[in-house]
């Protein structure tokens, strides 16, 4: 089985992941702008959250062009790490009461679902690699 076939299988299992991570990146940019406007600690957190939140989808796009199964898995793992980092920043924003802390609940739910999907993709890809 080639890497391209593996990618198609993952997409067939979760066809919405690229669209969801793109929408999440768009919401990340919106929250980044709100955090920067708020100033203070929010100003400092904003760039780190922006980097993590926008790189999830970018790394999935790179995974799509992976040259091997191992390359595909590595890139999806990077996307997973970035999703976990974005989740950390969202949790911090929420519990610290940084503006707009009330707006992050939906984003936190979405990133939790993205993490779960990416874990499934990585597990299936690794299983496929081991079973060939």
Regions found by a protein language model. Give the residues of each.
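Short, C-terminally biased terminal segments at protein or domain edges
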Residues: 1-132
